[in-house]
Structure formats: structure tokens, C-alpha cells
A protein has these predicted regions:
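Outer-membrane beta-barrel proteins
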Residues: 2-8, 18-236
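Repetitive helical segments and hydrophobic/amphipathic motifs
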Residues: 12-15
Length: 236
């Protein structure tokens, strides 16, 4: 699950890093972009059709604040807005993400945080990139989490192992993801379940001598739900 107006970006930067005059301009890193995807697949789940997914990130000395969104061409697709505060050093990374996904015709209010009414989901992540392999663990710790077999908060979790490689002139990434215990948050997770097995290929397409367009294609399979997805995307 998983970009802001110029004014919002400025407020985010100021809140995180303090006065701009106190920080040298070349020490702050910022990026903005968007993906156009033929379908919205996330951790082995179908979350929508053709979507525009903008993002913006501001970082300083390993600390970062990012916003990400998704709006589907189909009006019945959820509208999503996520905020992530993270820190990384070397191969280590940790973050907290606030997911906010508004279902079609729902009246969910963004600043509604009351228990049993909010649609926010708060997730903690910790991981390490060893180079050949990256391992990440994610756990929902608050908000609209799923439930376990007893009807209690599941603290829904997900572990992902990914390995990048090159083949045939393309950049590839193979990954496998699983849920360690039962939760209604992930499709058909009745216990430990491998819910995402996928491979992504990406390449920069040359448009002109000075402009390239990153493109990617992802094939994924969810053994738990016996679902498969094939997504194509362009990054700007």
C-alpha cells in the first residue's frame, strides 16, 4: 500500500529539518515522481486497476519523510495516501508508515483516529540490505488492523526477502513474502502463509538522447489465494 502539493512539501521539510537557513542546501535530498501502473498489486493482493501513484520524499542524513498516494482510473478503486518516516544507515533501515485508504463511497475522515472508527493503519518496519539479499519485517501496531482466529487484534505482519540480479540487459528482482500468523488483513492468511512470490524486470527506455523513461513489469503469484498478477508500469 502505499506523493503532495508544493506547500505541503515545504511544511513537511520545515517540520522535519527545522529552519532552512540552519541547514546547507546541498545536505538535503529531495525527490518527486509518479508511477503509472496497469494494476495495483501489493503484497500478493489486488488493490485496484490502472492507477496513478505520485510520491515525494525529503531526506537529511539518513532521516527521511515521504508521502505516497494512489488514485485509480476506476472510481470504485480506493483512494490512498500514505506517510512514512524512516531512517537508514548502511544496509539497516527502520520506518513507521501511516496508511490511509478510503474505500469507494465511504465517509472516512482523514483526522479520525478514534479506535474502531479510524481507517488509518500504522505499520513499523525494520530491515537490512545485505547486498545480494534484502530482508524486511513489517508489523501493524495500531489503527484498523485485521483480527486473528480469536477475533483479537492480529498485529498483522509480513516478511519479505528480495534479491536483485541482472539478466539479458535488464535489472531484475526476485522476491518472496509471507505472513507469519493468521490475520484478516492479508487475503487468506489462516496461519503462516506464503502470499507473494514475484519477479520484477526493469529497464530505462531511451526516448531521446537526453531523456529516458524507466519501465518495469512485475509477475507475481499468491500461493495462499491461488491468485496471479501481471503489472506493467512507467516511472516519471
Amino acid at each position: 500500500m502505499r506523493r503532495l502539493t508544493k506547500a505541503s512539501a515545504m511544511l513537511m521539510s520545515a517540520a522535519l529539518f527545522g529552519s532552512a537557513s540552519a541547514i546547507a542546501q546541498d545536505e538535503v535530498e529531495a525527490s518527486v515522481g509518479a508511477d503509472l501502473v496497469s494494476g495495483y498489486e501489493w503484497r500478493g493482493q489486488d488493490l485496484g486497476g490502472f492507477s496513478v501513484q505520485p510520491s515525494i520524499t525529503v531526506g537529511y542524513k539518513g532521516l527521511s519523510l515521504g508521502a505516497w498516494g494512489s488514485v485509480g482510473l476506476d472510481k470504485e478503486d480506493n483512494k490512498e495516501f500514505d506517510l512514512t518516516l524512516g531512517y537508514s544507515t548502511g544496509g539497516f533501515s527502520a520506518s513507521v508508515t501511516d496508511y490511509w485508504s478510503l474505500p469507494y463511497q465511504a465517509e472516512g475522515k482523514y483526522f479520525q483516529y478514534e479506535a474502531h472508527k479510524t481507517i488509518h493503519v500504522f505499520e513499523a518496519q525494520v530491515g537490512y540490505d545485505f547486498g545480494p539479499v534484502a530482508v524486511n519485517w513489517y508489523t501493524n501496531f495500531a489503527g484498523a488492523d485485521g483480527s486473528n482466529d480469536d477475533g483479537d487484534r492480529a498485529y498483522s505482519s509480513y516478511i519479505n526477502i528480495a534479491a536483485p540480479f541482472k539478466l539479458g540487459g535488464l535489472d531484475w528482482k526476485a522476491e518472496i513474502g509471507a505472513t507469519p500468523w493468521a490475520t484478516t488483513f492479508y487475503t487468506d492468511a489462516n496461519g503462516f502463509a506464503v502470499c507473494n512470490f514475484g519477479v520484477t524486470a526493469s529497464k530505462d527506455i531511451k526516448v531521446t538522447d537526453s531523456f529516458t523513461l524507466p519501465a518495469f513489469a512485475k509477475l507475481s503469484f499468491n500461493p495462499a489465494s491461488e491468485s496471479t498478477y501481471f503489472v506493467f508500469g512507467l516511472s516519471f
